[in-house]
Regions:
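A conserved ligand/cofactor-binding region detector
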Residues: 1-404
Length: 404
């Protein structure tokens, strides 16, 4: 699972498996009985330890526990993810079988996500790093560091990025008729739509920028084109509302002459790998802003950085290791880190309503959600989720207002 959220640790109804997979059910019972006897012996009959680790319990088959029982290795996909698995999600299993747990941080294929999708940058690297040496020995990319002050190489890098932006803008214009401002920074967030990934936090920041521009026409602001791409799970109503919100904000900004050539928001439809291959080389800022402790790793963060985009992110998932690799001077880190976020959530003392009442900037942004964006749609439901919670969950479950 590439998140530590409980919803990703599947639990199947026992009756479903009994009815449709009777032979598998017989095998599961035997595995479960043997495993539960071993757990009972190890924990001296302590049900507070045995029950959470059981495979079949309370009429459910717990798939993650089945995997823990059966697997030779349990592999975290970032250093932080592995630590959370051992410390929290499977802490008793780790205490019993520590040798099972290991870490191999996710990675990407640089031949696909650099050489193939960014041919101009590939040509520059070949000129600087021994032709195609880096394709087989990716550590050869470190040879680029010697050119950090080379005016010719830096100029060529800038031109490559400009060319890629123009190529992507031309493709978007052909596909959708939307004209991107290639003189603005391309600030990109593309990934599965989920509340913990905090596309909503990004939108709230855009609303703030819009309000700031309207209040002060001389606001010194580097022109920015925000690009979103995401798909929501079919039954995930909140995620679909956030997509609608992104489009409402985009339409409002597109209608406002004051935003022309300064601020733009575009939702890229049908985000997919073939689109990503065009987008990554053109991107300049990469939004990796999940709530600390919720993202297992992420690979988009790696694809963006490999194509020269700077990361704006939290210390979550593989961002932690990217930060260690590139140094704090080459990445924009903000927000709570995992221990602080976990402690605040566990304390029950997080009160987003107090933030709303005491922070005039956040107050204005959320009031805009309630008023809407000139298209006849209001987002009171999203404001209520942030301030009051919903569906049995706490207010602002993923602490967007805290990290705003």
């Amino acid at each position: 699972n590439h998140t530590v959220l409980a919803e990703a640790l599947e639990r199947w109804p026992q009756q479903l498996i009994e009815k449709w997979l009777p032979r598998i059910w017989q095998i599961l019972i035997e595995i479960s009985n043997r495993y539960q006897r071993a757990l009972t012996d190890y924990f001296h009959g302590d049900l507070s330890k045995v029950a959470p680790m059981a495979i079949i319990w309370g009429g459910e088959v717990r798939m993650a526990n089945l995997c823990v029982c059966a697997c030779f290795k349990i592999n975290g996909v970032s250093a932080l993810h592995s630590d959370i698995l051992k410390r929290d999600v499977f802490h008793d299993a780790y205490a019993r079988t520590p040798d099972k747990f290991t870490n191999v941080t996710n990675g990407i294929d640089h031949r696909r996500w650099l050489s193939e999708c960014n041919p101009e940058l590939d040509a520059l690297i070949r000129d600087c790093c021994g032709k195609d040496k880096y394709l087989l020995q990716p550590d050869a990319l470190k040879e680029l560091e010697q050119y950090r002050d080379d005016a010719g190489v830096l100029s060529r890098l800038g031109q490559i990025k400009a060319d890629n932006k123009k190529a992507f803008a031309a493709w978007v214009a052909r596909e959708s008729g939307v004209i991107l401002n290639t003189d603005a920074l391309f600030d990109v967030q593309v990934k599965r739509l989920h509340e913990y990934k905090r596309q909503l936090l990004n939108v709230l920041h855009i609303i703030y920028l819009y309000q700031r521009m309207k209040a002060d026409p001389h606001f010194d602001f580097t022109p920015r084109t925000y690009l979103f791409g995401a798909k929501a799970a079919p039954g995930y109503a909140v995620a679909k509302r956030i997509i609608r919100l992104i489009n409402s904000v985009a339409d409002m900004i597109a209608r406002d002459p004051a935003c022309k050539d300064r601020l733009q928001v575009v939702f890229l439809e049908n985000y997919r790998v073939s689109l990503a291959e065009k987008l990554m080389p053109a991107s300049e800022l990469s939004e990796q802003i999940s709530t600390a402790g919720k993202e297992a790793s992420g690979t988009g963060n790696m694809k963006f950085m490999m194509n020269g985009a700077l990361t704006i992110g939290t210390m979550d998932g593989a961002n932690v290791e990217i930060c260690e690799a590139v140094g704090r001077d080459n990445i924009f880190i903000f927000g709570m880190e995992t221990p602080e976020a976990e402690a605040l959530a566990a304390s029950g003392n997080y009160e987003p309503m107090l933030i709303y009442q005491n922070d005039p900037v956040i107050h204005r942004v959320l009031d805009q959600l309630i008023r809407g964006f000139g298209d006849g749609v209001d987002y009171t439901d999203i404001a209520n989720l942030l301030l009051h919670g919903g569906n049995g969950g706490p207010a602002d479950r993923y602490m967007s207002l805290k990290d705003f």
